[in-house]
Amino acid sequence: MGQKINPTGFRVGVIRDWDAKWYADKDFAAFLHEDIEIRNFINKKLQDASVSRIEIERAAKRVNISIHTAKPGMVIGKGGSEVENLRKQLNKLTGRQVHINIVEIKKPDLDAKLVGENIARQLEQRIAFRRAMRQAMQRTMRAGAKGIKTQASGRLNGADIARREHYNEGLVPLHTLRADIDYAWEEAATTYGRIGIKTWINRGEILPEKPKQNSVKGGK
């Protein structure tokens, strides 16, 4: 099962938390569609800002959005002008008060989405897919990853018949729930058609906290 299921969803509730943190009864469908609109709007608006993850929290009529990015300066802008403009646009989109928090990704080479985006952009620039994948894997391993696996699917190098190729280095234990596996899927729009890029990165293990032992032992 660990080989088939999405590694991110497989670990939610174990070592990962939800990207959407809110509760709704009758308004669940409306909030879900609003979340999708928010994510699509931010990803389109900040497509060059290396945005990896968007967390959404709701409290009454307020929406708190945390944007994880490797380029916080590009998102914030000069004097905070860009992020303020983004906040106003999201206020108009949702009809609610929006608060935006920018979270910097200090090691982008350990983020599966950013690594996949980098490979996809190189393929769009007609760089050989094997070279792009292997260079990305080397940078990730140098950044401190325990393992990485990449896969490209489609008309690779313009071949008439679509195929898939994958490369891996180190350990990527997909079925080990305590393993911090980051997974992402990206697309490269090439002249030969679309090529899918999948990336798995093992960032080590997250061990559960041990229960505290009682300081007072048995007595009378």
Curated annotation (Swiss-Prot):
Pfam families xref list: KH_2, Ribosomal_S3_C
CDD domains for the chain: KH-II_30S_S3
Domain KH type-2 stretches: 38-106
Disulphide bridges: none
KW rRNA processing (keyword) present: no
Keywords of this entry: Ribonucleoprotein, Ribosomal protein, RNA-binding, rRNA-binding
Matching InterPro entries: KH_dom, KH_dom-like_a/b, KH_dom_type_2, KH_sf_prok-type, Ribosomal_S3_C_sf, Ribosomal_uS3_bac-typ, Ribosomal_uS3_C, Ribosomal_uS3_CS
GO MF term (any one): structural constituent of ribosome
Keyword Coiled coil: no
GO cellular component: cytosolic small ribosomal subunit
GO terms under biological process: translation
Family: Belongs to the universal ribosomal protein uS3 family.
Known function: Binds the lower part of the 30S subunit head. Binds mRNA in the 70S ribosome, positioning it for translation.
Complex formation: Part of the 30S ribosomal subunit. Forms a tight complex with proteins S10 and S14.
HAMAP family: Ribosomal_uS3_B
Protein's UniProt name: Small ribosomal subunit protein uS3
